[in-house]
A protein has these predicted regions:
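Flexible loop/hinge segments at secondary-structure junctions
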Residues: 15-18, 36-374
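Secretory targeting signatures
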Residues: 1-46
Length: 374
């Protein structure tokens, strides 16, 4: 038969004392999570962050999301849904996402009302993509480009285009313009350039995330415009450089502010940002622009693109806890430092040191329940 084994009874530590020690340990560990003493990687605790907005930087943000998870050891999953700058701004203002991407800086009234700060995270170019197989290389200047999108120039063999492209045999086909159908930071950048170089465009259409383009085909997002240009003969449209390169879409060489024809490259985009003076993260960004920048090597449709986050991350309207707040700021810090090395392979220019310094100051000022996160 089975034998019952009993241990000798000894006087030991009272059970109430043991229970008290266990409770104390639990409290200490919980406090460590709450104060960030344990990193997400060390604890194994999963954190999920969500973003949405500009498609201009989306290839880079998606790359960052993967590399941050794979290289840092932090168990932080970041999803970014695109949707356009306008949609991203709406979602961050409604606190439906943790961060938003936008190529169009907010008006001071909006950033102040919502308590949002700007973090420029990369530099890019908007290029003029075209689908006209008979043209080997296309050169355009700003005024001619504005005339095309205002439909004052409607055929590829127009004298204004011919004058810029000596030696090219231009076809007589009608030009089909492809534009963004959604509220778009890329449209904000492109229309801003046209408004800078054409007083007629500025007076009739102006700069905006949405423009009432005449007789144009609309498509959603940079991916949508890219594919529509590729599949529409005799068309012209505007997309971010990364999309043109990834999809082998030809794009025009543009005449810049100083009269030089310049292709969109990392170097020409960086040149456009040389010497730019930026405000504080919670300052007025509404007038920040590097469009039509001076300099022989500057590409004329270059732009910063921004991440928007709340200066105070705690809110009764969201479920963000302190661990998530720390993860968000750590991710953004990584993006403007280690993350910059991933930009050039995707045709985004790395931030100048002076811009990184502005971002550092901004990130070091962000709080959770009144306490600085970093």
């Amino acid at each position: 038969s089975e034998r019952e084994i009993s241990m000798p009874h000894k006087r030991g530590t009272p059970w109430l004392v043991i229970l008290g020690v266990i409770v104390a340990v639990i409290i200490v560990v919980a406090a460590a999570f709450a104060t960030g003493l344990l990193s997400t990687g060390e604890s194994g605790r999963s954190v999920s962050l969500t973003g949405a907005g500009a498609t201009f930087p989306m290839p880079l943000i998606l790359k960052w999301s993967d590399e941050y998870y794979n290289t840092t050891g932090h168990n932080v999953r970041i999803s970014y849904g695109g949707g356009g700058s306008g949609a991203g701004i709406t979602q961050i203002e409604d606190r439906h996402v943790d961060f938003a991407g936008t190529d169009a800086p907010l008006a001071t009234s909006d950033s102040s009302a919502y308590g949002l700060v700007h973090i420029p995270e990369t530099l890019g170019a908007v290029v003029v993509a075209f689908n006209e197989p008979s043209i080997q290389s296309l050169r355009l200047d700003g005024p001619t480009l504005a005339e095309i999108f205002m439909k004052n120039i409607t055929s590829w063999d127009d004298p204004a285009i011919a004058a810029l492209n000596p030696g090219e045999v231009l076809p007589s086909f009608q030009i089909t313009t492809i534009v963004r159908s959604d509220s778009s930071g890329t449209t904000f950048v492109f229309s801003g350039y046209l408004a800078t170089v054409s007083s007629e465009f500025a007076a009739i259409y102006g700069q905006g995330k949405s423009v009432n383009w005449p007789d144009a085909i609309g498509a959603s997002g940079n991916p949508g415009v890219t594919q529509t240009v590729k599949t529409t003969a005799h068309s012209i449209g505007y997309i971010e450089l990364s999309y043109a390169m990834a999809n082998d879409v030809p794009h025009a060489i543009l005449k810049n502010h100083d009269g030089y024809f310049v292709n969109a490259t990392l170097e020409s985009v960086t040149s456009a940002a040389t010497g730019v003076v930026l405000p504080a993260g919670d300052g007025d960004w509404s007038h920040v622009s590097i469009l039509d920048a001076a300099g022989a090597e500057s590409y004329p449709i270059s732009s910063f693109t921004y991440i928007l986050v709340y200066k105070e991350l705690f809110s009764n309207d969201t479920k963000m806890n302190k661990t998530a707040a720390e993860a968000l700021i750590d991710f953004l810090w990584w993006c403007v430092h280690q993350g910059q090395s991933y930009g050039p392979t995707l045709y985004y220019a790395s931030l100048p040191a002076s811009v990184v310094s502005v971002d550092e100051t901004t990130l070091n000022s962000i709080t959770y329940q009144g306490q600085v996160v970093r």
